[in-house]
């Protein structure tokens, strides 16, 4: 997806897949606890099923946490961050991205304000899919989004 967009923009000096690998979550990382139990337990459960996929998910969240640190450094005291996230399902386990976002910013001196939950407007994906490619075995896709609001102390 990212590569095709770059071709259209004339920025296609990388091989297909190279850009995706360089973006957030594009590489693999050893699965290690963050110290945030809701995410740690889900990652451990995914790791028991598919260590390669767990490694990719771990890398995404490590880089996501790093991006939150970068944003936190730019926000002034009493400033707010508002992140719209979805809690996707991997290997049958829902990732608590909304809670992880709040926790990540709390580690950077923010206080949690609230989370607004709403249906995803104009959803273009089916409400269920079959990630295992086994007939009849379907799981729900994301149908809610979370607007997580925090304030810098």
Which positions does each model-derived feature cover?
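Class I S-adenosyl-L-methionine-dependent methyltransferase catalytic core
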Residues: 1-83, 87-153
